[in-house]
């Protein structure tokens, strides 16, 4: 009889019993090999019966890798060894199940502590980060609104400064025009002053000439009066002479009238020019004073606006610095949060991977356990036959006889028993179906 159980897609087991029955004796040879956890299970049986002698030979390879040779001894010792090793294997399986349950409990506790879900279906839970993200969004919106308001105020201040700059340029042009007019009026005033000086000089000249004429006239009158006081006998044969007194009086009257007319004309012209010039000077002085006051007011307004502009620029710079710092802080916080999220996702992925690996390993162990249990059950059935019994922790074997129990006579016929086990497994070494076929053939003795 030969039996081989190993991991594969499909296995067939054959138990040919080659031997001869002679007399009442029964002989059996047993070779069994069982690999460790995760490997197959193989057994080979051969039996022969001759004469009146009964001999039993049994050899079994151990369940571990270290024992690779064949063991010899009687069947009871071999079965006891197999039972001990099977108990050790079951203890190892139970320890692995306990370790797996412990790991599952730890994984479940970790998920209960760090996130909702179960070991079979886990979802990302970022609900605890939502309030922080909403707060950061609100702060960003508030900062953006403040920045927009500051930019709007800066633009308004810039437009106001541009308007005042235009007004200042217009007033400066008006001031320059007024100064040019004042300079022109000053030149006119200088010309009028020169003309007045000339007129005064002419007046003085005419006054001196008049004084000189009066003095000459007085001297001539005195000379004529002195001459008239003496005895002068003049005989005139010519026509009567011209009266000099009348002539001088006429000349004096003409000169006085001419001087008076010139004086009146000069005074009238001077008064007219002085009045118009004085009126123009008064108007120009008033305009100059008004322009000077307005210029002073514009200078004061310009200084105020410059101070306000400087304060707004300083406020803008401080707001820009604050905005830059706030953006940097928020970027740093977002980067830290993103790094934490990435780390948590990586940990979650690692835990999932480990869980899947442990799940697959656990399933493989369960499949191996079921496979080994079925193989052990089949092994017990093959060893004990129809009368054999197999338990979870210990196995008892009985003598398997072909034909009648006890000693067989030499003349009994030769019997060949063939037991075939068909087992179908999938790719994960999971047993799908198991079938056991027993065939018995009889033949004549030699």
Swiss-Prot record:
Ranges where the record places region Coil 1A: 75-110
Domain of life where this protein originates: Eukaryota
Record-level Gene Ontology MF annotations: protein heterodimerization activity; structural molecule activity
Compositional bias annotation for Polar residues: 400-410
InterPro entries cross-referenced by the UniProt entry: IF_rod_dom, Keratin_I
Region (Coil 1B): 133-224
Keyword terms of this UniProt record: Coiled coil, Cytoplasm, Intermediate filament, Keratin, Phosphoprotein
Phosphoserine PTM positions: 438
Chain intervals for the UniProt region annotation (Coil 2): 248-386
Similarity field: Belongs to the intermediate filament family.
Subunit structure: Heterodimer of a type I and a type II keratin. Heterodimer with type II keratin KRT5 leading to the formation of keratin intermediate filament (KIF) network. Interacts with KRT6A to form filaments.
Extra information: There are two types of cytoskeletal and microfibrillar keratin: I (acidic; 40-55 kDa) and II (neutral to basic; 56-70 kDa).
Protein name per UniProt: Keratin, type I cytoskeletal 25
Organism, as annotated: Rattus norvegicus
Gene this chain is encoded by: Krt25
């Amino acid at each position: 009889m030969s039996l081989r159980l190993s991991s594969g897609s499909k296995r067939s087991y054959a138990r040919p019993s080659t031997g001869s029955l002679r007399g009442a004796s029964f002989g059996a040879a047993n070779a069994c090999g069982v690999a460790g956890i995760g490997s197959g299970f193989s057994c080979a049986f051969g039996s022969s019966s001759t004469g009146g002698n009964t001999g039993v030979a049994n050899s079994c390879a151990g369940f571990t890798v270290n024992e690779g040779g064949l063991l010899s001894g009687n069947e009871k010792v071999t079965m006891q060894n197999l039972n001990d090793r099977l108990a050790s294997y079951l203890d190892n399986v139970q320890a692995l199940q306990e370790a797996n349950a412990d790991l599952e409990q730890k994984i479940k506790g970790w998920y209960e502590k760090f996130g909702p879900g179960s070991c079979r279906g886990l979802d990302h839970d970022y609900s605890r980060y939502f309030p922080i993200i909403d707060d950061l969004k609100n702060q960003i919106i508030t900062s953006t609104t403040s920045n927009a308001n500051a930019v709007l105020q800066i633009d308004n201040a810039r437009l106001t400064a541009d308007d005042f700059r235009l007004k200042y340029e217009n007033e400066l042009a008006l001031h320059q025009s007024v100064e040019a007019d004042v300079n022109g009026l000053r030149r006119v005033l200088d010309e009028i002053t020169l003309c007045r000086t000339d007129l005064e000089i002419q007046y003085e000249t005419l006054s001196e000439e008049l004084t000189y004429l009066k003095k000459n006239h007085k001297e001539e009158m005195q000379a004529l009066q002195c001459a008239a006081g003496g005895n002068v006998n003049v005989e005139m044969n010519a026509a009567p002479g011209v009266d000099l007194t009348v002539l001088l009086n006429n000349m004096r009257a003409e000169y006085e009238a001419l001087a008076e007319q010139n004086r009146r004309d000069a005074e009238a012209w001077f008064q007219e020019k002085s009045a118009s010039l004085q009126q123009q000077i008064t108007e120009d002085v008033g305009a100059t004073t008004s322009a000077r006051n307005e210029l002073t007011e514009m200078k004061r307004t310009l200084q105020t606006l410059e101070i306000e502009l400087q304060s707004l620029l300083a406020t803008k710079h401080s707001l820009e610095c604050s905005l830059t710092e706030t953006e940097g802080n928020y970027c740093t916080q977002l980067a830290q949060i993103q790094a934490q999220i990435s780390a948590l996702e990586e940990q979650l992925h690692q835990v999932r991977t480990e869980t899947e690996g442990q799940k697959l390993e656990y399933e493989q162990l369960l499949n191996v356990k079921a496979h080994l249990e079925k193989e052990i059950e089949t092994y017990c059935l093959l060893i004990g036959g129809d009368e054999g019994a197999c338990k979870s922790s210990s196995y008892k074997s009985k003598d398997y006889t072909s034909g009648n129990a006890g000693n067989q006579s030499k003349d009994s016929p030769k019997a060949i028993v063939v037991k075939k086990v068909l087992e179908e497994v999938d790719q994960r070494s999971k047993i799908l179906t198991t079938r056991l076929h027993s065939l018995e053939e009889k033949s004549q003795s030699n």
